[in-house]
Amino acid sequence: MFKFCIDLGVELPPEQVPIVQKKAVEYARRWAKPVIVATQMLESMISSPVPTRAEVSDVANAVLDGADAVMLSGETSVGQYPIETVQIMARILESTEERGADRIPPLGTKPRTQGGAITLAAVEVAEFVEAKFICIFTESGDSARRMSRLRSLIPMIAFTPEDSIRRRMSLTWGIKSALVDRVQHTDEMYHQVDEYLMGQGLAKDGDKVVVISGSPPG
């Protein structure tokens, strides 16, 4: 779901925009829909090498509201400082997530689907056993999005046999993705997880990892 700041500003009185934005993001998260906040995020950087403090707060608040991504438009397409704009936005996002990820509001409703219940249980188990990673096998991306919306601070990796889904996961909060072969048995899934994590130097023998799958293999 795109949330265009300028469109809300046209359709609503300005004083209503912040609350409507927060509610829109919350609603999308509840239904496991990715949210991209866009338009005029760092508008002043079209002609200035530094953003205004209000713009910095706008970008940071998009993260704290629970958005998956933010998007630049005129700042990089016609602006005088496209590289600096991207660098500054990245710094704002990284700093906000590093210092304020625990301030992102939790979902206010209980899961209504089997997939939602499984991902919630997986997060609770992972946090209880202090797992190093949560690994999600998905063919459509739905399980990864349901996991992402819970905003766990444990690193999450989505394994998928679909390259288009792997690319799409780059816009899902907190999800790294890996392309794997389609397998016929859960033991093969565990082998793929071991091969990826150990091969990338991300885990070692004895590390705990929670693995879930959106559908049975085969």
Label every model-predicted segment.
Residues 30, 89-123:
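Long, charged amphipathic helices and adjacent flexible linkers at domain junctions
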Residues 30-48, 131, 152-156:
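Short beta-strand/loop segments at the ligand-binding rim of alpha/beta enzyme cores
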Residues 4, 40, 62, 147, ...:
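Conserved, mostly hydrophobic/aromatic
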Residues 143-145, 151-189:
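Nucleotide-binding motor/catalytic cores of P-loop/tubulin-like NTPases across gene-expression machines
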Residues 3-10, 59-82:
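Glycine-rich phosphate-binding active-site loops on the catalytic face of alpha/beta enzymes
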Residues 190, 194-196, 204-217:
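C-terminal binding/interaction regions
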Residues 12-27, 79-89:
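Active-site-adjacent beta->alpha loops and helix N-cap segments on the catalytic face
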Residues 1, 43-65:
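Catalytic cores of alpha/beta
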